[in-house]
Amino acid sequence: VSDPVPPDSILAFAEKLGADLWVMGKDFNFSGDKLQWSWAGRGRRYSGLAYPALRGANQLLNASGVLAALEVMRPQLPVTAQAIRNGLAMVALTGRFQIVPGEPVLVLDVAHNPHSVSALAANLDAMGFYPTTHAVFGAMADKDLAAMFQKMLPLVDQWYFADLPLPRASSAAQLVEFW
């Protein structure tokens, strides 16, 4: 679990299953400087790693969780240190703080809960000044809209609400009403 403060429900369920749950800060951790980072787990260390190719504040947490998962699966799925370095350098995830080249600057992100919206807000804020920020937004009806809007309202100048073609989705009209 790469969340530094995992939900109690995850910890309890893992204990109920008798799972060997690896937890960030207890079973593995990372550290870094401006040029590289390192990871340490129960019995293995990686030093001098290049930062993941993905942009965003949470990427070392995510990469650390991936390295922990690979370490757990090592007996069934051995992965070389070079393959890990290549993977970190070449990783891409469409729609996760994806910056589309051109003018205007276009950022695509599928942030879908308060935690991921917080990361999106931090990443947008770190990008620097842009005269205006427009957001196209759609969401499922069961999401915590108040928490998501609270994080994004200070950063967005113009909102465009979208209907999503899913039964669980809030309509654009419902989003406008909530906003």
Regions found by a protein language model. Give the residues of each.
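C-terminal helical cap/extension that packs against the catalytic core
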Residues: 3-22, 31-34, 105-108, 114, ...
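Nucleotide phosphate-binding/pyrophosphate-handling subdomain across enzymes
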Residues: 40-158
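Acidic, Mg2+-coordinating active-site environments of NTP-dependent enzymes
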Residues: 1-46, 63, 67-85
